[in-house]
Amino acid sequence: MIPLEIIEVEGIIIDEKPYGETSKILNIITKDKGVIGVLAKGAKRLKSPLRSVSERFCYASFNISYKEDKLSILLSADVINPFSNIKKDIKKVSYLNFLSELTSGVIKQNDDERIYDIYLSAILKIEEGFDPSV
């Protein structure tokens, strides 16, 4: 049996998929662990505390019941930045989707922490109003 480890990790949700009636599976890009697959139980319920912290591109500090190479469980999260300015602009969302796919692919091949730092810096610049097409 794989031992469970409760960890706190800072990351950004790069993908979310529905799971059953009320839950979501999230892919979170992190500095220390690369990309983590996480089950957010009940996150689609209206009154769930995980509802607002389980949206795509949410930058947060996540408390996770971690299982290496398996689906982990999201216990709670504290939002650092929801990147609301990006979510209001379809062009910025498109660029961020592309950047997320690219970063996810690169991090699977090389879990260098600098990749996460560059990704986060790019998102912060886009959030501040930098034109991503430049």
Residue spans of the language-model regions?
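Non-catalytic alpha-helical scaffolds and adjoining flexible linkers that form interface surfaces
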Residues: M1-K24, I29-V134
